[in-house]
Amino acid sequence: MTVLDALIRVQREMDGSIGFRCSCRVGMCGTCAVQVNRIPRLMCSTLVKTLDAEVVTVEPLPHYPVIKDVAVSLAPFFAQWRRAQAAFRPKHADAPTLAIIGKDSRFRQLAATKRDCITCGACYAACSITGMNVRYLGPAAINKALLRVLDPRDAARADRLKTLDQSSDGVWRCHTQFNCTAVCPRKIDLTDSIVRVKRALLRPGKALTV
Amino acid sequence: MTSSVGAVLKKYRWQFSGMVAWTLQRVTGILLLLYLLLHVHTISKLSQGPAAFDAAIATFSSPFFKCLEIGLLGVVVLHAFNGIRITLVDLGIGVGKQRQLFWTITVGMGLLVFLAGAIPILLFAVLKVR
């Protein structure tokens, strides 16, 4: 039984008024992230028996406004997502053929480990910096920006780097605590992404490669 | 609270070592700052002549202060080796293996150096073994 199953049972059999969010139930939509026993994780991918605890505590994710019970608004998360310009901006929008990224290219290989973000918001909740500074980009937005910045087809590299380089709310706020990496349900090494962005910013002369 | 901390550590098998290391670095940093103040205070006795300085140093050769010195060594070693870990991470070395980095460098190598210094201090300065 997953924590989500347990909560659904509670809702059906004990208290129909409790509020939580879920959708796919298989860990691919990122809707049901909450704090289970003080760690941000997906309810649908957390088996109660693996928690190895007498009492299972389900709380709303920290650093987000609560809508109802354990359902939170991801508005702060997506505000940063937009600020990092997560959307792809093509260099050649009118190109007659598709740009090809070879499967052996270094960008393609790095992207394979970084592109699985399901925007569940767990990393943003686990990060202690986002808790102190609402303007900080947060791990997911930085990871997304890194993917765009390294993409040879992307046209907005300079804009994105400028946002990432902001001293008070860009990558430099990261203290490499690795909490984001520890909680990511997709096992994305988010701290690694942030370190890569920092190093790229420190060596502007060097071509941005992987 | 304690049970939830225990559950966190159990479940994640110290995946949060990055947070532990960060906290250690802050705490040891503040302790080193306090030590620095004491150190400057003692050194400033030199301006009052050799006798005043010798008196200050004599205070610190008591077994109690020698024990504190072992603690100081531990704080310095933790801060230094964790600093090396942070530098490596910032250089992009071993970021994907941060837990192993914490256990081998900060804890492992730190412990070796700490014991190499702490045992002689304990034997010869505190217990006065000859």
Where are each of the predicted segments found?
Chain A
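Active-site phosphate-binding and catalytic loops of NTP-dependent enzymes
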Residues: 15-21
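Short strand-turn-strand beta-turns centered on an Asx-Gly dipeptide
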Residues: 35-39
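Structured interaction patches on ligand/partner-binding surfaces of diverse proteins
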Residues: 40-52
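Aromatic- and Lys/Arg-enriched surface recognition patch
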Residues: 48, 55-60
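Short beta-strand scaffold segments in enzyme catalytic cores
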Residues: 33-34, 127
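Ferredoxin-type iron-sulfur electron-transfer modules in oxidoreductases and energy-metabolism complexes
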Residues: 1-13, 59-210
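Short, structured protein-protein interaction patches enriched in aromatics and acidic/basic residues
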Residues: 24-33
